[in-house]
A protein has these predicted regions:
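Multi-pass alpha-helical transmembrane bundle typical of ion/small-solute transporters
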Residues: 3-224
Length: 224
């Protein structure tokens, strides 16, 4: 019986049983690319320019924490963008709920230039100042990793994966493993700052280089 001829409660039940409309993710990906581009550009604005009359060579040497933090954050955002791109190769479309989750993912990404600047500016002020800065920095990246896991769980549970990925146990297992371990790894990286802040920063830099490694990407081409 057509819905308009049925009792109102039946129409309401049928509408609730229907899945969310799946639409193209093109605009979502374009918006996300813009956020990534802005965040990665803002990083350089926090590197201080030597003042006129200042010893430029000495000033540049003293700015090494800013340069190291910049490189680490630049590569980290590049890694996040790459993973975001690769995730969307197995996403067949988006829904209102998936849009909301993606917005939450972009929030800590847009925020990352701030903890990067805090780390660089307070590096020489003692461990009691640097450790909280590194915890904020690492916590921000860990939050990104957590939101990637939420996105993966949402997409896989709501039927948003393309048929090949949805039917591949290997892809699903790999996605579950990676998106489960990544938040833990970044939390441990942040905790390493309690031992030595430079160790924590090196861990984050090493992770970014590892994730971006061409050989690793080639070996895991089917990875979500």
């Amino acid at each position: 019986m057509p819905c308009h001829l049925s009792p109102p409660y039946r129409c309401a039940m049928e509408s609730r049983e229907q899945p969310e409309d799946v639409v193209s993710s093109a605009r979502l990906e374009t918006f996300a690319d813009g956020v990534f581009a802005i965040a990665i550009t803002l990083l350089v604005l926090e590197i201080r320019i030597p003042d006129p009359g200042e010893n430029v060579s000495r000033a540049l040497v003293d700015l090494w924490p800013s340069f190291l933090a910049y490189v680490t954050s630049f590569l980290t955002i590049g890694t996040i963008w790459t993973d975001h791109h690769r995730l969307f190769t197995v996403i067949r479309g988006t829904t209102h709920g998936f849009l909301f989750v993606n917005i939450l993912l972009l929030m800590p990404i847009a925020f990352l230039p701030y903890p990067t600047a805090v780390v660089a500016r307070h590096w020489f002020e003692g461990k009691d100042q640097v450790v909280p800065a590194m915890l904020l920095y690492g916590g921000t990246i860990a939050l990104v990793a957590i939101m990637f896991r939420v996105m993966w769980l949402y997409a896989s549970s709501r039927g948003l994966l393309v048929a090949e990925a949805a039917s591949s146990r290997a892809v699903r297992r790999r996605g579950e493993l990676i998106y489960r371990l990544a938040p833990l790894i970044y939390v441990l990286g942040a905790a390493a700052s309690v031992i030595d802040p430079i160790l924590s920063l090196i861990v984050f830099l090493g992770l970014a280089v590892y994730w971006l490694s061409p050989s690793r990407r080639g070996a895991n081409s089917s990875r979500p």
